[in-house]
């Protein structure tokens, strides 16, 4: 009887844990075993090349991710931007960037803004092996590459001009300038800064990510002994301002790996990725005990709270080979996974649907949302600072926005308006701005009192 009670007690203690382990994660645990090779986007040939190296045996993770990058930079199988010299900066310059990280000791090597050297990942590897630095940039990076034995090449001018000339004829749209004169949305420059008082906070312009037109690719390899390496390669954003460094070269932005917990690959708007270091955040979320699925989603939601129009994706892998992904702004985010199951090599293209960015930002469904004006008096005489009216129409994947002024706060507030002086003051303030549009759309009208929400973005 005593042993029966112990068994019953043990079952009661373990049952919740067993249920938790058996619950279905947001992204199903893959039926693929180690070793594991993951690469961003639907570039199966490059993934296959990397996998061929990885499955030769343990401790081949570094060579595997390098081989994947080499395949992309030496062929057109990873889209014409990476292999075809068709991602020039605004002056027509062709530069590359690449990075490599070792999850065992956190060694890191990267190059950025490097012109005339095709083998960017090889130079990044040399930075890791032969220097105490982490990142070399520009002409000095090219000189370092030549000293390491890499040959300088002349890029195809005709290919570059085929891309650059239509852009120049189209008044250099799109570009990456703001708060300058002449207006960046109608000119090629030369630009000069606007005075500070004339600066406007505009919604960040995001450029659509089209299939086969990616300017960055990432690879992550995990072997049977738990060794991790990650690598990235990028041609840089098209028509970028010369001198710009992208996320592919910045630790934690495009790639990160730590043998103790796992690794991550991020891709998309590099200037946003560099501000949040999502690959690093995801790995640290794993360290804190989150699953790859929850880590990926949490990081993506964090990006969206600050940059609602972000386009891109994130893949997170645990040290045990469980992986998941999250994305925003795309119809679908694809990545390629190769591994072994029952002694046989398996490869598949994973595709996930992206987060509904509007639910992240507004916490609500599709429809019409309004944000109302200025500083108005709440009941009790408190000042509440809000944004001027912004209408956001959220239909089936179509966004239309009307902006009047800059963001103010990143939280919601409600205001009770009572009859009397405060109500009249609120009413007059609303009349002075587009706030009457809000009242009309919400079906609210005088006489007061009324109650309505303020939705922040």
UniProtKB/Swiss-Prot annotation:
Molecular functions per Gene Ontology: N4-(beta-N-acetylglucosaminyl)-L-asparaginase activity
Signal peptide positions (record): 1-20
Transmembrane segments: none
Keywords: Disulfide bond, Signal
GO CC term, one of those recorded: lysosome
Pfam families: Asparaginase_2
Official protein name in the record: L-asparaginase-like protein GA18140
